[in-house]
C-alpha cells in the first residue's frame, strides 16, 4: 500500500500573499484521511501540489504506490468529451499516453492509408495492449454498468455532459477504487451524489484497502469514514495545518481543547514579555546610578531580545464569520402552482402547490429531473411574463414539458445553479461585479462592495476573477448576488455542495430569516432537517409529497 508525506510546504500567490505556510501532513498506508477547512483556504491548491501540478516555494512531497486523482471539476463537465475520455483521464500515466497515441494514429489512418501510417497504428495498438488497455476496458465496463446502468461499449462515445453530476462522480470514483493506483486524492467526492450513492461511497471507502486523502464538508461522510482529519486553518501570514489523529466524533472537542491551550500559551507568553520588559526598565534605571548593575541590565536585555526573537507561540486560528442577509418580500399566497406538469422524458404528470414562506426540499436520485424542475421555475414557468423574469442574467435553457407551471403574483425567482454556470461573470473580478451591477440590481461604491464581500469572507478575493475562485467561494458569491437581487423565491440546486461547514451554517441561518419561499434540491441530510416538507421524485417516475425526507429512492428506469 502507498502513502503521502507533505513536509513544511509553503506557497505564495502571484500577488505575493502567502497562501500556505509550512504545511505538513502524513497519510499512512490504508488510512482514510479528510482534508477540511474554509473555502478558499487552499485545500485544492494543496492537492495540486501533492499531485505535482504546482511546485511549492519550499518544502517537500513524497509518497509511494501510484496516485489516482479525482479533480473537483468532475460532476460539472460540460464540454464535448466522451465517457471514454473521462475514464482515460483518471487512468495511470502510461495508459493515458497510450490512449492519446492510439487516438492520433486512428485519426491519421482516416487521412491516409500508407504503410508508415499503418505501422504507426499497429504500434499504437501494441502499446495500448501492453499498457493494459484491454484489461482497463473490461474494468470500465463494470464501472459504467454500476454508475449509469449500461456497458462500456454502449457508453464509450456518449458525451459526458449528458450525464448528471452524480453519474459523472460515481463513474470516476468506481474507476479509481477498482484501478491499480494505491493512493487516491479525491476533491469533493460526495458532491453531486444522491444519498444512496453517498451511502455507497461511505461503505466503499471503509472497505477499500487503498490510502485515501479526500476533501469534503459532508459531516455524515466525515463521521463514517475519516480516521484522521487535517484542517487547513486561516492564519494572518499564511494558512497552516492542524492534524487530528481521531475521527470526526471527537474532532470538535479536540479542536476546542487545542485552541484553549494555544490561548493559554499566548497569554503566558504575553505575561512573560511584560515582566521581562519591566525588569529591563528597572535595571536600566538602577544601572544609571549604580555601575554594579550594568551586568544585570545587559543580561536582562539579552534575555528579552532572545525571548522576542523566538517569537510568540502559535496564534489561535482566525474563526470564520459569514453573515448572509437574505431578505425576500411578500408575494401571493400561492407562490408556485403546477398542474398536470410533465417533464418530458423524465417524470410523469403531477400537481403541486407551494405556499408563500414554505421551505420545500426536492429529493430523488440523480438524473430524475429535479434540476430540470428548478430550471423551469427559474425561467418563470411555462409562460413567463415580465413580472416573473429571473433576477439574474444567467442564461437558462428551455425545459421540455407539458402541462403548466406558474408563479404567483410578485414572485421573482432567484436561481442558484448547482454547476455555478455564470458565463456573464467570466473574466470579471468580484469588486467589478458588485460595482457595476446589472439590469437586475444596482451597482455600489467600491467601499460598500468591499464591506459586503467581507460579510461573506470574500474580501480577500475581491480582485480575483470569478472563474479563479474555489467552488465554495463561487457558491458564496452566488448567494450574495441572490441577496442583492430582490428575489422572493429562492430556487437552490444543491447549495451546500461546495460550502464549508461554517458557510453552510450561515446559509441555514440566512434562510431562516428570509421572508419568502425556498425550493431546494438537496442530498445533504443535515441541511434537509430544516425544511417543512418534501417533494420526492420517485423511482417509478412519479412525483409525490411527503412530510418526512426519503433518501432511498433508486434511479428512475428509462432508456439509456
Where are these regions (language model features)?
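An exposure/low-complexity boundary signal
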Residues: 300-305, 482-483
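A short, surface-exposed helix-loop junction/capping segment
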Residues: 117-127, 277-287, 319
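Short amphipathic coiled-coil heptad-repeat segments
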Residues: 141-148, 279-282, 303-310
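ABC ATP-binding cassette signature C-motif
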Residues: 1-262, 324, 330-560
